[in-house]
């Protein structure tokens, strides 16, 4: 999440950005992105398949919440521009719809594939609106850059809120928890405590 947000900062270079969409917002990466973007002053719209988590997402800083069914459909060639930026953690049709709804010169930062690793889109939004699609590769980032980004992110994260979004399980409990993760029944992060 922090790497995606840093990329947005670097590429926009002071451009006016207000409305940012975060997909997979109840997940580990998405929830942190909502928190950080809100602290940076953006109007964050969260996308989630869990209507029951709207209050949770608003407590993290989302101004509004949209059900993922609005995005999980075949995209148009181009749609009304709604977002100055997007942080996508899911891929697939949700990402494709976010792309066609991105405003001129917006950036779409891709940092996950929770739904699928596929993306079927067209070139129209890129040609007509000049939007940018950036993949986040934190694995090959230098230690110096990681430390800088993590340090900046740490200033923006509410660790009390973050702690509430972490569920700790034992290795044995992970067997029961993992299918719930795959079904989208878990929000936030799951921490496996090997000493539990």
Regions found by a protein language model. Name each.
Residues 1-39:
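Short internal alpha-helix immediately C-terminal to a glycine-rich phosphate-binding loop
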Residues 11-18, 69-83, 140-141, 161:
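Short, flexible, glycine-rich and Lys/Arg-enriched loop motifs at helix boundaries
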Residues 19, 42-44, 107, 132:
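Residues at the starts of beta-strands that form the adenosine-phosphate
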Residues 30, 54, 95-96, 118-119, ...:
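Short, well-ordered alpha-helical microsegments
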Residues 38-93:
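Adenosine-nucleotide cofactor-binding segment
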Residues 93-159:
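Glycine-rich phosphate-binding loop and adjacent beta-alpha segment
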Residues 144-196:
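C-terminal hydrophobic helical "lid"/dimerization subdomain
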């Amino acid at each position: 999440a922090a790497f995606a947000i840093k990329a947005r900062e670097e590429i926009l270079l002071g451009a006016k950005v207000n409305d940012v969409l975060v997909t997979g917002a109840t997940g580990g990466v998405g929830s942190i992105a909502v928190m950080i973007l809100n602290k940076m002053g953006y109007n964050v719209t969260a996308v989630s398949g869990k209507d029951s988590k709207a209050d949770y997402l608003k407590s993290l800083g989302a101004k509004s919440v949209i059900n993922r069914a609005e995005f999980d459909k075949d995209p148009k060639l181009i749609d009304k521009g709604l977002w100055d930026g997007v942080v996508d953690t899911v891929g697939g049709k949700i990402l494709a719809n976010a792309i066609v709804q991105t405003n001129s010169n917006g950036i779409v930062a891709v940092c996950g594939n929770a739904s699928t690793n596929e993306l079927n889109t067209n070139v129209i939004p890129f040609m007509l609106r000049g939007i940018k699609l950036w993949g986040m590769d934190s694995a090959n980032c230098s230690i110096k850059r990681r430390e800088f980004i993590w340090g900046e992110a740490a200033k923006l994260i509410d660790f009390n809120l973050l702690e509430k979004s972490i569920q700790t399980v034992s290795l044995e409990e992970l067997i029961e928890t993992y299918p719930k993760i795959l079904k989208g029944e878990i929000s936030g992060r799951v921490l496996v405590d090997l000493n539990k």
